[in-house]
Amino acid sequence: MSFQRSIKVAFDKTSGEILEADDVFDTAKNSFELRRQYHRDEVELYCCECDQKLNVSGSKYDRLHFKHQPNAAFCYLKETDLSQEETEQLAQLYRGKESARHKTLKNKIAEKLYNLDGVDSICVDDTFIYDGNEKRRPDVYCKYLDKELVFEIQLSDLSLRYIYDRHDFYKRKGVFLIWILDDFDVHGQ
């Protein structure tokens, strides 16, 4: 069985960059250089899904990888048994979240919401919604006539499992979810 990373990308808050696990851990030299930087607090690694701190950890075969800290709260990447395809789709999602187009769409939605009567408490990418140990950070959050609404923007492939997970989470919380999907084939899923 081949080695499969469950966390393929991490966000370095020091540099503002997304780090690709397969790139930063491609050679022993690169791997241990990142580990050195981590232990000297030269990088601050965070999970792109849950925004919790990550460690640089080693396996019993000395393969370095990103790992949630001990006693970390719920994270979809940590708690869910994802296939290799689903893991890659999520990595694409996190890469896409940082694209200029994604940021433009979030800000454009917020701008349009500001002009609508009955809409308030508009937040772009900075509000967490909690359900027990689980939390989600929608791209755009607002209240419309005292109803909570969230917008999730997706510009790359996404598994139905991920869509249903988000749907179920927000439904449990009584929050209305609006997906903005790019070139999504409903019938092909």
Regions found by a protein language model. Give the residues of each.
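Nuclease-adjacent, charged terminal/linker segments that flank catalytic cores
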Residues: 1-104, 111
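Active-site metal-binding core of divalent-cation-utilizing nuclease and nuclease-like domains
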Residues: 110-150, 158
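Catalytic cores of nucleic-acid endonucleases
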Residues: 154-189
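Short amphipathic alpha-helical segments
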Residues: 101-105, 159-162
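Short, contiguous strand/loop micro-motifs
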Residues: 96-97, 151-154
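Short flexible/disordered coil segments
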Residues: 5-6, 73, 121, 179-189
